[in-house]
């Protein structure tokens, strides 16, 4: 491999996207090869500059490529279409067409891994798990396929309420060594599983490690901040979450990543919980305008943003209805753990019917059991039960829920 391309690829692997772009352009000037073109396109795409990447990729004639070359070109082309150009249907159709053209088993496994990642982001984690499981069980899957499949499986498992395999899957994704943002996909799975297991200190510690490991001014740093803010919101550290989310949202806004809409969703939730009604409304509007098929995995978070914004506007029934819709959206997508978190918020907002929903979900683990106890106590107007739930949530560091449950206990006593 020419020295210039190797240097650009190393910068890409290190997450230094600006340097990768500069080195990639220099390499392309010296050697108009497919390798140079692909390295430059990836550096541009990972900065959120999808149109620029598309121009670089469009210069390639796929009919003139061998199967390995076709794969090397098709994967970043599809990824760019899905995220950066916001054309998920086109990207999925393109990948399926490419899948029909390749003949080798390793190539098929790699395409299936990316199709699974697309399915996850499009709100179909169960389909994503089917594809990921096939890839991870295949002796033909290369490290790139394993990285994509394992990272997607880690996040899907966590959001679906299956926590036991999350760390192992994240480890497989890391060991695959594929560059990019996969560490944050699997990391979100890990922090989600830790929160749902009541280990909020470990969740926050991991999120901070991911932030610290990423270079500032890069999308990876902003995504790490997003994961940290999600844990802070679960803790009830809303004041601390807002500046983190504001920085992440601004950094991710120019990109096409699915993380971008999630940043606005979480920021709207946080601002609403602080009573900043106007600001929350503006952030909710941004979240709604940016949300689409490529971020459908996070539809429950958008509904929760509506719930908390309604609560800030003193629309109690609207808040409860939106929180219920968050839980229903999560359940429809098989995201049971996300549904439980939504229903905890529903109880905080005054929903007396959440207990039967939580019971139906059957999510095992610390938070699943605590959520059911809390919802049952609220439905029954059981002051002692609410006080016990407040103490239990406080003990694991979910202070926001603890404060609300304590207030509900006081109200149940007639205080």
What does each model-found stretch correspond to?
Residues 1-2, 415:
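Accessible peptide chain termini
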Residues 64-67, 169, 190-415:
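Helix-coil-helix junctions within alpha-helical repeat/solenoid scaffolds
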Residues 2-231, 243:
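Internal alpha-solenoid helical repeat scaffolds
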């Amino acid at each position: 491999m020419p020295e210039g391309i190797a240097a650009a690829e190393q910068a890409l692997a290190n997450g230094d996207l600006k340097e990768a772009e500069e080195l990639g352009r220099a390499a392309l000037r010296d050697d108009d090869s497919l390798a140079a073109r692909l390295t430059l396109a990836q550096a541009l795409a990972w900065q959120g500059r999808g149109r620029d990447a598309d121009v670089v990729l469009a210069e390639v004639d796929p009919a003139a490529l061998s199967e390995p070359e076709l794969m090397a070109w098709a994967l970043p082309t599809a990824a760019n279409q899905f995220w950066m150009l916001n054309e998920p249907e086109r990207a999925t159709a393109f990948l399926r067409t490419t899948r029909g053209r390749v003949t080798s088993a390793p190539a098929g496994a790699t395409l299936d891994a990316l199709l699974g990642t697309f399915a996850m982001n499009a709100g179909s984690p169960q389909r994503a798990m089917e594809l990921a499981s096939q890839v991870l069980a295949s002796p033909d899957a290369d490290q790139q396929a394993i990285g994509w499949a394992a990272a997607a499986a880690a996040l899907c498992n966590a959001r679906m309420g299956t926590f036991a395999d999350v760390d192992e899957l994240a480890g497989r994704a890391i060991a695959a060594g594929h560059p990019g943002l996969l560490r944050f996909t699997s990391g979100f799975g890990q922090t989600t599983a830790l929160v749902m297991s009541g280990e909020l200190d470990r969740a926050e510690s991991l999120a901070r490690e991911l932030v610290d490991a990423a270079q500032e001014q890069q999308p990876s740093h902003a995504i790490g901040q997003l994961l940290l803010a999600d844990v802070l919101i679960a803790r009830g550290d809303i004041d601390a979450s807002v500046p983190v989310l504001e920085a992440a949202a601004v950094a991710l806004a120019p990109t096409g990543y699915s993380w971008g809409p999630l940043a606005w969703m979480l920021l709207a939730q946080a601002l609403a919980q602080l009573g900043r009604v106007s600001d929350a409304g503006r952030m909710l509007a941004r979240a709604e305008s940016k949300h689409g098929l490529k971020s459908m995995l996070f539809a429950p978070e958008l509904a929760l943003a509506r719930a908390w914004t309604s609560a800030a506007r003193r629309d109690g029934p609207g808040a409860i209805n939106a929180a219920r819709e968050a839980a229903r959206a999560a359940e429809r997508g098989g995201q049971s753990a996300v549904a439980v978190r939504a229903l905890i918020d529903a109880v905080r907002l005054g929903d007396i019917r959440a207990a039967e929903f939580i019971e139906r979900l059957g999510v095992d683990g610390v938070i699943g059991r605590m959520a059911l106890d809390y919802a049952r106590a609220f439905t029954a107007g059981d002051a002692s039960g609410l006080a016990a739930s407040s103490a239990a949530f406080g003990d694991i560091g979910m202070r926001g829920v603890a404060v609300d449950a304590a207030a509900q206990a006081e109200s149940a006593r007639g205080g």
